[in-house]
């Protein structure tokens, strides 16, 4: 199957269960086409695929957070999904993932500080001295059905193509129609906040330096200073409406030639 055929297959595999279906259909067609015009053809993958791509690209991507690993984080293809973007040569050049959590009797602050957000079994798998401190005022209100977006990576030669404005929105929109979540969250490094990455992703509700990891397994020195970003379904729909109305899907055809 050609990569262009894969993109058509990806659209066919999208299961629209919740939300404004006609509106979401229009968004998905425009967004998937926008990625294809940039030489990136989308398909669904697995969390094993995501980890394999991460481990093969550590020169341009920090180690995958445990929340998006099957072991020890508990990520499964039944409670999450992975989107891969391939170039015409079939190489993975972009990734995106999402998980759903049932937090009807708990909240983000409790789950993160207990490390259950990061590990299936924190008592067994946490590093010695590993801890998480959450200071975001909204953290205790993030409960119910909560989707986590992340696992974002673009191969360096595919950056500056606005893929960060396209593929994460596809992931968030699919999470909404698949799970009908109450909130979608993401943790963003301070470096990416300084680059206004959160704004390009469409987040309006973000608290910098509000999730602090000590002795994290994700980074060599063990410390991470993260921003907590949150988006409600209504905020997502408003954001997607803006994308449909204002995002220019067209791009110089020479980019497709360079990416082939």
Each model region followed by its residue ranges:
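N-terminal capping/interface segment
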Residues: 1-56
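Contiguous N-terminal and early-domain "leader" segments and peripheral loops that mark the onset or edge
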Residues: 1-18, 100-121, 231-244
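Amphipathic, soluble alpha/beta structural segments
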Residues: 17, 25-37, 136, 148-152, ...
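A conserved beta-strand-loop-helix scaffold within acyl/acetyltransferase catalytic domains
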Residues: 34-146, 150-152
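Acyl-donor binding region in acyl/amide transferases
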Residues: 109-211, 215-220
């Amino acid at each position: 199957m050609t990569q262009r055929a894969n993109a058509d297959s990806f659209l066919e595999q999208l299961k629209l269960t919740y939300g404004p279906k006609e509106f979401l259909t229009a968004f998905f067609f425009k967004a998937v086409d926008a990625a294809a015009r940039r030489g990136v053809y989308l398909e669904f993958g697995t969390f094993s695929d995501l980890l394999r791509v991460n481990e093969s690209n550590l020169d341009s991507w920090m180690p995958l957070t445990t929340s998006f690993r099957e072991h020890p984080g508990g990520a499964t293809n039944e409670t999450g999904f992975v989107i891969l973007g391939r170039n015409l040569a079939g190489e993975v050049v972009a990734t995106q993932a999402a998980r759903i959590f049932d937090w009807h009797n708990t909240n983000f602050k409790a789950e993160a500080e207990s490390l259950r957000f990061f590990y299936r079994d924190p008592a067994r798998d946490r590093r010695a001295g590993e801890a998480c401190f959450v200071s975001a005022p909204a953290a205790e209100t993030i409960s119910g059905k909560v989707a986590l977006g992340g696992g974002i990576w673009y191969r360096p030669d595919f950056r500056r193509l606005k893929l960060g404005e396209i593929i994460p929105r596809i992931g968030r929109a699919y999470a909404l129609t698949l799970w009908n979540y109450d909130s979608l969250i993401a943790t963003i490094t301070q470096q990416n906040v300084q680059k206004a990455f959160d704004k390009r992703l469409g987040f309006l509700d973000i608290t910098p330096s509000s999730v602090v990891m000590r002795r994290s397994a994700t980074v060599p020195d063990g410390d991470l200073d993260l921003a907590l970003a949150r988006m409600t379904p209504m905020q997502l729909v408003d954001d997607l409406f803006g994308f449909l109305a204002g995002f220019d899907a067209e791009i110089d055809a020479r980019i497709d030639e360079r990416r082939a």
